Each structure stands twice: as structure tokens, then as C-alpha cells.
Design a protein with these regions (language model features):
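Active-site-adjacent structural elements that line small-molecule/cofactor binding pockets in enzymes
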Residues: 1-138
């Protein structure tokens, strides 16, 4: 993807996948390209993040597990010669309450993406989001 986003023509010949010279347009507005974020909780995901991505997107991780993962991510990044601070963590799928969100931020998340229940009307959804905002931003 990085080659497609940054080069006029790109090709790839690897062990598992090949593609001939191709062009891809339009090019991303973000330079050099949009952030690449990998999700997952597999044992090797943190190494993949260090090797290929700009961030990690774990789903509903506990603060304790996140703290452990952040330390491991920092260790792997340092070994690879990367600045650990260049790798973001965006936890998603969380309940939108202060007692859930704040411990995740304290444990090393750069951002927490909340999940909300669906409402039937725009007014109901607005009311819910205003309550969430009042709880989180005080």
C-alpha cells in the first residue's frame, strides 16, 4: 500500500503475493500516506505493528493487559530502532463511561473509541451523546 500511495507506478513480488506494475489514483491527501493501523490480539500482532504500522487497534482490552502490551510494544520498537512514541494505541469497543475510559488512557492508550447503543431518532441519539460527553469531559 505504501508503494501504491507514494509512487507513480508500483509492483510487488513476494513469497505469497505478486502484482505487476500498477497505478493507483487518487493518491492520499495525507503525506506521505494515511496512518496504517493494525488490529487484533494475536501473540505476534505487536511485532507486526512495529514492522509495518503506525498504530495498534485492540478491541475491548483491559487496562492491565493494555499496560503490559504498551511495555512490550515499546520494547519491540526500541529493538527495531523505532521511537516507541511514534506508535499509537487506539482502543475500541469500549463502554462510554469515565471509569472505563480513564484507566485505559492511564494505561497507555492514546485514544479510546467508545461504543454506544443505537437509538431510534436523532433526538434520542443526541441526548445520549450529550450525556456521554458530560460524563467524559468534566
Amino acid at each position: 500500500m505504501k508503494a501504491l500511495w507514494t509512487q507513480e507506478t508500483a509492483e510487488f513480488h513476494g513469497e505469497f503475493f505478486n502484482f505487476p506494475p500498477v497505478r493507483s489514483y487518487p493518491k492520499p491527501a495525507q503525506k506521505p500516506y494515511p496512518p496504517i493501523v493494525l488490529g487484533g490480539g494475536a501473540k505476534n500482532v505487536l511485532q507486526r505493528v512495529v514492522d509495518h504500522a503506525d498504530g495498534w487497534l485492540p478491541n475491548r482490552v483491559s487496562p492491565e493487559d493494555l499496560r503490559t502490551a504498551r511495555k512490550e510494544l515499546d520494547r519491540l520498537a526500541t529493538i527495531a530502532g523505532r521511537d516507541p512514541a511514534s506508535i499509537t494505541i487506539s482502543v475500541h469497543g469500549q463502554v462510554p463511561t469515565r471509569d472505563i475510559v480513564l484507566p485505559l488512557l492511564e494505561a497507555g492508550a492514546d485514544r479510546v473509541i467508545i461504543r454506544t447503543v443505537h437509538k431510534n431518532t436523532e433526538a434520542e441519539m443526541t441526548e445520549l451523546l450529550e450525556k456521554v460527553a458530560a460524563d467524559l469531559i468534566r
